[in-house]
């Protein structure tokens, strides 16, 4: 029998895009790999990434992550110019790319980055096919969330 690997302390999540779930209805989620350079991997291991304004563009049969900011480390290579906001290629199956093309061509759909995390030794990004929320939808979600918290609080005190 093989031994299980010891779980490393800390979370595998590098960055979350909380604003995406607030501003969009997420209909489908996909997991994609990222084509990264060495300095970007070091920055991700240090947790210096921001995907708050990032989205996915589809061009020439490929998907690219646009708007993600990976802050370079201070001790990065001096002979290589680090571009923190460069467009990074997403690694998806052709079937997944075809599905995304079909969904994006419909009016009002976009693809946003939801989270950036480690899966084994690989950096993955969770992307979601999304449709924009109206202001009243955001208010309804906020009311539902507050009611769920109040309900949990009431149930906690009722058990005493």
UniProtKB/Swiss-Prot annotation:
Q: Between which residues do disulfide bridges form?
A: none
Q: Which domain of life is it from?
A: Bacteria
InterPro entries per UniProt: SmpB, SsrA-bd_prot, SsrA-bd_prot_CS
Q: CDD domains of this UniProt entry?
A: SmpB (cd09294)
This entry's Gene Ontology molecular function terms read: RNA binding
One GO cellular component this record assigns the protein to is: cytosol
> Coiled coil: which residue ranges?
none
Q: Mind listing the GO biological process terms from this record?
A: trans-translation
Enumerate the SUPFAM superfamilies for this protein.
Small protein B (SmpB) (SSF74982)
> Which cellular compartments is it found in?
Cytoplasm
Q: Which UniProt keywords apply?
A: Cytoplasm, RNA-binding
Q: Does the keyword Cytoplasm apply?
A: yes
Any matching Pfam family: SmpB
Q: Which family does it belong to?
A: Belongs to the SmpB family.
User: Main role?
Assistant: Required for rescue of stalled ribosomes mediated by trans-translation. Binds to transfer-messenger RNA (tmRNA), required for stable association of tmRNA with ribosomes. tmRNA and SmpB together mimic tRNA shape, replacing the anticodon stem-loop with SmpB. tmRNA is encoded by the ssrA gene; the 2 termini fold to resemble tRNA(Ala) and it encodes a 'tag peptide', a short internal open reading frame. During trans-translation Ala-aminoacylated tmRNA acts like a tRNA, entering the A-site of stalled ribosomes, displacing the stalled mRNA.
Q: What is this protein called?
A: SsrA-binding protein
Phylogenetic placement of the source organism = Bacteria, Pseudomonadati, Pseudomonadota, Gammaproteobacteria, Enterobacterales
